[in-house]
Swiss-Prot record:
It comes from Saccharomyces cerevisiae (strain ATCC 204508 / S288c) (Baker's yeast). Present with 3510 molecules/cell in log phase SD medium. Residues 253-269 have a biased composition (Low complexity). GO terms for cellular component: mitochondrion. This is Uncharacterized protein YDR124W.
Length: 324
């Protein structure tokens, strides 16, 4: 019953964030009337922010005022992710990385590998293929530069780093702090707020998995359904801005026709997101005897209805419309 109620609350929060109006009354299966509780028809109620901030007194016969939830405006829907279920964690991470799009994921994966395996180029060169991969590298992922991997393999590699490699390292929290800092400094996260929020949730998961003293069984994270919708709106908004810029440029060209001057275009300097030289640790942060069979990622699911609606309905092909 409680699981069903959590799903209902999350769905209503998502609808509220999208501007829907609703008033929902719930009567529990074993709703009992006691002397301490007024004789109400329903045990709980949920009201959207757009209907009314303060429920009127006419609600009193229907539900106890203390059991009325009024959703705030612009509330960020959240989900509770169980930390003792690796498949659900893997699914959330996989979907989060997919929402980032693949150009950013290529840069992030290369940066992470430089930090967790500082001397990889000399000890585990890509030129040796699968025979030269480190112990922590997923067995079912080819040993290639992240740029050259298939999308599914690249996302699987990133999930492995968060779920397996970092928690197994003797310097997990120190390395995680370094990963968090250098990732946040990448240009992509300065331009797009939604992607920054997505990575914040990814690192929250990593922090819980790396912290041996963390006793909670669940963690509250932003609902990827809502973030996907916001990213879709942001993408269409920026595409509209680009179209306006093109129109302005055409107008300027028409105005300047017949003159010697022409509008100049200032091209931004290309910033490298992968040129980073990690600090050395007293010993290799990734243990040599790391067993890849532990928590091996298998049977990846692209999305889970608890977390994300089908991405094909929200965006077009990842391969054709990657953007930074």
């Amino acid at each position: 019953m409680r699981i069903g109620m959590e799903e209902l609350r999350r769905a209503l929060a998502l609808l509220n964030g999208q501007g829907y109006e609703f008033m929902v009354f719930i009567k529990e299966k074993d709703h009992l009337i006691s002397e301490s509780i007024p004789k109400n028809l329903f045990s709980e109620s949920f009201i959207s922010s757009s209907i009314e901030k303060n429920p009127p007194l006419t609600f009193d016969p229907l539900v106890n005022r203390k059991r009325i939830t009024v959703y705030e405006e612009n509330i960020q829907p959240a989900i509770m992710l169980p930390l003792d279920q690796p498949l659900l964690i893997q699914n959330y991470l996989y979907t989060a990385f997919k929402l980032l799009r693949q150009v950013p994921c290529k840069a992030i994966a290369k940066l992470w590998i430089k930090i967790i395996e500082p001397r990889k180029k000399t000890r585990f060169p890509y030129i040796k293929g699968n025979a030269g991969r480190p112990e922590w590298w997923p067995k079912d992922v080819e040993h290639k530069e992240p740029d050259h991997l298939q999308k599914a393999d690249r996302l699987k590699l990133m999930c492995t780093i968060i779920m397996n490699v970092l928690p197994q390292s003797p310097f997990s929290l120190e390395i995680l702090d370094e990963l968090t800092g250098v990732t946040a400094a990448m240009t992509i996260f300065k331009k797009e707020t939604v992607k920054k929020v997505i990575m914040k949730n990814v690192f929250e998961i990593a922090k819980c998995l790396c912290n041996k003293d963390f006793k909670q069984k669940t963690i509250s994270l932003d609902d990827l359904n809502d973030l996907a919708q916001k990213q879709k709106k942001s993408y269409h908004s920026r595409r509209f801005d680009v179209n306006k810029m093109v129109k302005v440029e055409k107008d300027l060209l028409q105005q300047s026709s017949g003159s010697d001057s022409s509008p100049s275009m200032i091209l931004p300097s290309k910033e490298s997101d992968t040129e980073y030289f990690p600090r050395e640790y007293p010993k290799d942060p990734v243990s040599e005897d790391y067993s890849n069979s532990i928590s091996r990622l298998e049977n990846l699911v692209e999305f889970d209805p608890l977390f994300l609606t089908k991405l094909d309905e929200l965006t077009s092909s990842d391969d054709c419309k990657d953007f930074i």
